[in-house]
């Protein structure tokens, strides 16, 4: 059984379950609060630092008001965005999201900078899914960090998106930021990611390259689709059903969790980049083992998180008008989820080769092939070899105001696929329109094939201010 983690247990609507549901709801709320303590602490500390900088900066401005000081040091912007996604197989929409987003940039002289972004989503489509436990309103922090800039090194502290992969779309080394499974599909060949609270030290190697050292003191784990969501994983839905019917119990791993560490040594010359990378941390989606609760004499599913190490090598080479990108990664002792509801460790080898080129004026072609394989005995439910391709082809029209194209990914080992036809029109510097069609294919139990009922059209408008 392929399962994922969630804190909200889906239960049947039969009689006699309500008291247990209330107790589990209280436990769930407490567990959610505990898991979010690192995020709350980091945001509180960051807010205190920003407030202190505003105060001290204002005092240092002679003959100027506090308002003038804030205007000199801060730049504010935001946007209003509306997105509608309608499945061609379902009556109810997949999403009808109204988003309000805000961003701010801060500068204190030349040595310290700050950036913060966040948004609030109101998804009106949730009201049409009567059995769903999705929230209608969802606030989210995008990124919020401070940068201390010196001549030889930069220190970046706060909530960040850290993407080290050289290859576009799929990457073997985007391991630091967990996938947001509440809405996992960003485009036809990329995933949504969550920011993490990290300290990132970047040391310049006198023009030869860069040394990047990262510590994530409180690991952040993937958020999963709520009960009844159109993006709810099939295995997760089954687990919730079994727990709700009282067929199995469920235990959670609430830590404490070890800090995560990563490092990158990158050399760059004209037309050539080479990087060596290291990661020691968690598989951010939950893993499950089955056992027996001898006190209650019942079957129990235990949710846990396991660590592993990864070593990688990446390069980017410019050849004529093209760029060739490669990534090779060893995920040492990686924890695979078995269909036997157990965790099996293997060494997993991954490789990506990508090529992109700009033809004519604006015709962009980006192709990628990937291959991965693990050693040892076969893990039940996991293909030993995974391979396929991703692509993106786009061009610009109407004086470069309209970008249109097609992008997607195909896993040849199991026929999983996601393809998106997309268009984006920039009316002016403030107003932007998007439209497209996305479809999925593959086996009903595959990662992408399970969403074949989510084939959909989408339309969006975004106004920036």
Predicted features along the sequence, with ranges:
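Transmembrane beta-strand segments of Gram-negative outer membrane beta-barrel proteins
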Residues: 66-88, 106, 113-116, 404
């Amino acid at each position: 059984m392929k399962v994922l983690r969630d804190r909200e247990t889906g239960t049947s609507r039969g009689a006699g379950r309500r008291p247990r549901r209330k107790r589990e709801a209280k436990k769930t709320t407490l567990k959610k609060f505990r898991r979010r303590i690192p995020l709350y602490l980091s945001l509180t500390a960051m807010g205190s630092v920003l407030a202190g900088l505003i105060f001290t900066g204002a005092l240092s401005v002679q003959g100027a008001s506090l308002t003038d000081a804030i205007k000199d040091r801060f730049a504010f912007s935001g946007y209003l965005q509306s997105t509608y996604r309608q499945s061609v197989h379902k009556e109810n929409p997949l999403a009808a999201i109204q988003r309000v987003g805000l961003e701010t940039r801060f500068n204190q002289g030349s040595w310290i900078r700050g950036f913060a972004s966040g948004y609030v989503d109101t998804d009106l489509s949730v009201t049409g899914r009567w059995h769903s436990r999705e929230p209608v309103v969802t606030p989210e922090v995008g990124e919020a960090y401070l940068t201390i800039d010196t001549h030889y090194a930069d220190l970046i502290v706060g909530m960040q998106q850290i993407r080290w992969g050289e290859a576009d779309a799929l990457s073997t080394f985007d391991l630091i930021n967990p996938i947001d499974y509440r809405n996992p599909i960003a485009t036809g060949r990329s995933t949504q990611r969550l920011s993490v609270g990290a300290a990132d030290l970047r040391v310049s190697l006198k023009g030869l390259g860069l040394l990047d050292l990262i510590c994530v003191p409180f690991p952040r784990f993937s958020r999963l689709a709520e009960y009844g969501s159109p993006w709810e994983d099939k295995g997760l839905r089954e687990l919730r059903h079994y727990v709700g019917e009282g067929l199995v119990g469920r235990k959670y791993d609430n830590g404490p969790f070890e800090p995560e560490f990563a490092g990158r040594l990158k050399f760059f010359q004209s037309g050539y980049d080479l990087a060596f990378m290291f990661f020691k941390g968690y598989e951010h989606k939950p893993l499950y083992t089955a056992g027996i609760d001898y006190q209650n004499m019942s079957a129990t599913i235990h949710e846990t998180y396991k660590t592993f190490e990864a070593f990688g090598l990446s390069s980017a080479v410019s050849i004529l008008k093209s760029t060739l990108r490669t990534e090779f990664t060893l995920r040492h002792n990686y924890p695979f989820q078995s269909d036997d509801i157990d965790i099996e460790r293997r060494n997993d080898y991954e490789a990506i080769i990508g090529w992109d080129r700009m033809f004519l004026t604006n015709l962009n072609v980006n192709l990628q092939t990937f291959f991965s394989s693990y050693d040892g005995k076969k893990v039940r439910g996991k293909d030993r070899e995974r391979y396929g391709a991703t692509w993106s082809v786009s061009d610009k029209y109407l004086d470069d105001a309209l970008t249109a194209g097609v992008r997607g990914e195909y896993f040849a080992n199991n026929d999983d696929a996601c393809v998106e036809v997309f268009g984006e029109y920039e009316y002016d510097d403030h107003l932007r329109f998007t439209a497209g069609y996305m479809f999925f294919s593959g086996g009903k139990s595959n990662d992408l094939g399970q969403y074949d009922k989510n084939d959909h059209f989408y339309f969006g408008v975004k106004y920036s201010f």
